[in-house]
Amino acid sequence: MAGYNKEEKAFTRSIHNLENSYFRTKFEPTLSRFQGCTSGIGVISDTDAQPLVINSHLGRFAIVTVAKIQNLDELAQQLLDQNMHFAELSSGKTNQTELISLLIIPGRTFVEGIENVFRHIKGSCSMLLLTEDGIIAARDKWGRTPIVIGRKEDGFAATSESTAFDNLDYQI
């Protein structure tokens, strides 16, 4: 999970391994760290540690992805050939979320960066970016991993599974 506190202009992040455990039991002890956050993103991933928090010329942002990138190794090598580096490895392999972030940051805007991602990857990727200005949701261009936007009086929510929206009084 990652949250942004506008008053403190600070990102908070917490990553937990959810194997053999429920989400709530892992995150409940750390929820107090998110006090004052007015927006947040999160994902449950079997492969990549996320969210990542990035500082770039676009500004600071947190990113989560749901992705299956078929040309991951090829793209990683291209980035290494451009003198880029990878700090996050997942089981000794390139973290897909970090690779996506490295494809975003050459853009002049977040939207241009996301378009760059979709031009380069083979496969699918949906993502949420938490910026200092809000959340950007980008669905994979093939629709394999959907993003549904819910709305209620005091805010919005984005998810890949809309079943919780009814319980939380969000309208699709």
Annotated model-derived regions:
Residues M1-I172:
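Conserved short alpha-helical segments that host acidic/polar catalytic motifs at enzyme active sites
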